[in-house]
């Protein structure tokens, strides 16, 4: 009888451990991914607005050193691990953060309102990327006119890497709690 009770206890304990890992793998993974996407999108949107405000200075009659601006664009891009484009209203890239690799690229059927009520989109951005990217845009305005847009693209793989690191922490915490519950 005692042996049967002990085996049931061990079986219940193992089932509890398995259910804990499955819960982390399903619920926590999705919640973490959604949180990271929204968090990165908000941070990139704020950065895009800052860059757009800097671009807007030249439309307000202030001089802008384009070489300095280009260098700053590259530095921000490197720091954020993103690709940054400045495009005109027609969707032609006029400046980028990758040493001009995308300059004069035409974004087919460019529609800055395509994001709807969200501040970001996820996809290959008009099939211009080989992998999915998180893209945000901010208008470049001056004198109540929109002259173009600042677009920032973050590879979704960067978000997946962060998600993986966070889930590793959750799995380790689960294992520690599981081991400590034996005491």
Annotate the PLM regions.
Residues 59, 141-143, 151-171:
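Helix-start (N-cap) segments at beta->loop->alpha junctions
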Residues 70, 92-131:
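Extracytoplasmic/periplasmic sensor domains and loops in membrane signaling proteins
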Residues 70-73, 137, 156:
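Extracytoplasmic/secreted envelope proteins and their assembly/folding machinery
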Residues 84, 134-137, 153:
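Amphipathic alpha-helical bundle/coiled-coil segments
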Residues 121, 129-141, 148:
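A short beta-strand signature within small-molecule sensing/ligand-binding domains used
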Residues 167-183:
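Selective recognition of signaling/oligomerization transmembrane alpha-helices
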